[in-house]
Amino acid sequence: LVAQYSDTHNMCEYDPVLEQYVAYCRNWFFSRRGIGRAVSDNFRRFPLSEEALWPDPTMDPDELWYANGKTKMPGTNDYHVMFPKRWSIRHDKFDIHLFTSPDNLIWHRVPGGPVCEVGDPGDWDGGVVAPGIGLVELPGGRMGVPLVGSKVPHKYPRKAPLGAIGWAWWPKGRLVAL
């Protein structure tokens, strides 16, 4: 257990290379939301998280990292990827980016901008897109992460049903191309 406020999805996994449990959760860095990381030998006891991702100098003052979407490349134990959701508070808009890590500790943003953005107004994903957890192989030579979409923005009054589920997908082996 850890006594920490985290109002978004959290994930915890056993890292066989580190031989420790690693959890990713909401964190606050200088009063701005970010992604926290906590590590423990004991699944029942975690320290407070430390900053893993926080708003960097390339981001606008109203932008922050909202949810982590941490996973691994399918079939690997040591190829870590994260699909964090960036929130522009001013525009009440989310988009999803791609980060990679060679060690489940140090994270780098893959250049090229968002890997997933909201759809057109009125579409099932026209207001919000949010990553799920788990990059998996899909039929038809694809791989993808679960995605939740909503027709209305995050701070817009809404009632059930709140959204729909879909996939953000790429051709297998083509998540990043050089």
Regions found by a protein language model. Give the residues of each.
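Carbohydrate-active catalytic/glycan-binding domains of CAZyme proteins
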Residues: 1-178
